[in-house]
């Protein structure tokens, strides 16, 4: 029995990055030998065991053979005669097909170290094409390591295009697509994930609402980058700089979906694209089974982001109505989330990346003022039932009006 550290832990250690999870491969052992050594079996489809002390995963070396469609159509063979090299060959990328033995020696049969140094994401073997999930995984790795200047090898991108054209991605379940997307959205450069999917044709298959934005022009006066798809990825990049929150990043990604519905004869203007986009956000979220809290914020951002940009000319009554509409009284975090997505929208434009966004500050300040109005004082003043809400609204509007006159006067007045 020989044990090797494999995959991501070896890769990240060689890159000088923190190692989070450790995976191990056991060569030359049977399931019974693992059980006799105190390991606990957890794998249903193939033999995976938990270490009795560390609880890290130890998998018996195995090979895989394509036996059906999609990413689940594989037959696994795990036995003592499976070599380490055979186990590593079934992995997706050369940089993930690395192992380290007890002496610290690196086993690298597929030149993963060379590709690490060259900053290349390259598939191990033609078997890559048998698993459509790998298209999304490569896109996610490209996003994860973009700050280290990794790029996808030409032959790997070509294979990803072939897989997409062959309809392989249609076998992916919504849950798997969303899981990879969720992980990609939490990387330092989530926009790279969607750019890679577009480069290989997968964006049109998996995210048609986003793909439809490319080639749709916006007024050059406001959008020097012109292309709405380009703007969308720029705003996502900016959102990633402004916030680590998945909610903020996903909502930013979806903020302009409505522009994809604008008839060509009305280009480059997109009046009413906010409310129009709400239906597309709902459609995308239902298809991919996106969690409700992310969906709800994304719909609000799609509908109201343009309103936030006009904050100086908004009436106090409109501002309080906005807080009602986003349910800020029960979910106060939404004020900050919407301020951040609106800022990402404005700064995600060519030449505006370093712009100030005072509207975000004003939104936060107005919220603090409105929130400070005391419900207790309204009740103690003798108001009852529906009168309480009406009086609260009246006092909130008055408080915001007083604040706005001093801090954010209407430029037209």
Curated annotation (Swiss-Prot):
Cofactor(s) required for function per UniProt: Mg(2+); Ni(2+)
- CDD domains linked to this entry: HDc, NT_ClassII-CCAase
| Keywords, in A-Z order | ATP-binding, Hydrolase, Magnesium, Metal-binding, Multifunctional enzyme, Nickel, Nucleotide-binding, Nucleotidyltransferase, RNA repair, RNA-binding, Transferase, tRNA processing
Tagged with keyword Transferase:
yes
Q: What's the catalysed reaction?
A: a tRNA precursor + 2 CTP + ATP = a tRNA with a 3' CCA end + 3 diphosphate; a tRNA with a 3' CCA end + 2 CTP + ATP = a tRNA with a 3' CCACCA end + 3 diphosphate
What the record says about family reads: Belongs to the tRNA nucleotidyltransferase/poly(A) polymerase family. Bacterial CCA-adding enzyme type 1 subfamily.
Additional remarks: A single active site specifically recognizes both ATP and CTP and is responsible for their addition.
Q: What is this protein called?
A: Multifunctional CCA protein
Q: What is the lineage of its organism?
A: Bacteria, Pseudomonadati, Pseudomonadota, Gammaproteobacteria, Enterobacterales
């Amino acid at each position: 029995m020989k044990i090797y550290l494999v995959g991501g832990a070896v890769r990240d250690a060689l890159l000088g990055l923190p190692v989070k999870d450790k995976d191990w491969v056991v060569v030359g052992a049977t399931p019974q030998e693992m059980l006799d050594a105190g390991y606990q079996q957890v794998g249903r489809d193939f033999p995976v065991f938990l270490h009795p002390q560390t609880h890290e995963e130890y998998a018996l070396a195995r090979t895989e053979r394509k036996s059906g469609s999609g990413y689940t159509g594989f037959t696994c063979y795990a036995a003592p005669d499976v070599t380490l090299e055979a186990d590593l060959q079934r992995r997706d990328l050369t940089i993930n097909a690395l192992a380290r033995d007890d002496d610290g020696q690196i086993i690298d049969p597929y030149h993963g170290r060379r590709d690490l140094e060259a900053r290349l994401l390259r598939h191990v073997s033609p078997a890559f094409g048998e698993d459509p999930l790998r298209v999304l995984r490569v896109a996610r790795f490209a996003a994860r390591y973009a700050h280290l200047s990794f790029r996808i090898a030409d032959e790997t991108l070509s294979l990803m295009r072939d897989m997409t054209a062959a309809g392989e991605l249609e076998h992916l379940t919504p849950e798997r697509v969303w899981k990879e997307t969720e992980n990609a959205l939490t990387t330092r450069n989530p926009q790279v994930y969607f750019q890679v999917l577009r480069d290989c044709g997968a964006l049109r298959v998996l995210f048609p609402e986003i793909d439809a934005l490319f080639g749709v022009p916006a007024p050059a006066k406001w959008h020097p980058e012109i292309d709405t798809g380009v703007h969308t990825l720029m705003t996502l990049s900016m959102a990633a700089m402004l916030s680590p929150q998945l909610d903020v990043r996903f909502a930013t990604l979806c903020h302009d979906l409505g522009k994809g519905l604008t008839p060509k004869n009305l280009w480059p203007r997109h009046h009413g694209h906010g409310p129009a986009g709400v239906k597309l956000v709902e459609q995308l979220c239902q298809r991919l089974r996106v969690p409700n809290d992310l969906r709800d914020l994304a719909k609000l951002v799609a509908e109201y982001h343009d309103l936030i940009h006009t904050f100086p000319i908004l009436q106090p009554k409109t501002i309080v109505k906005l807080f009602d509409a986003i349910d800020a009284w029960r979910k106060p975090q939404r004020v900050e989330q919407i301020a951040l997505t609106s800022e990402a929208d404005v700064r995600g434009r060519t030449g505006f990346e370093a712009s100030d966004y005072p509207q975000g500050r004003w939104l936060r300040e107005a919220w603090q003022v409105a929130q400070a109005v005391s419900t207790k004082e309204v009740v103690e003043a003798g108001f009852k039932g529906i009168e309480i809400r009406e009086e609260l609204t009246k006092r909130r509007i008055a408080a915001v009006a007083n604040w706005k006159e001093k801090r954010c006067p209407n430029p037209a007045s």
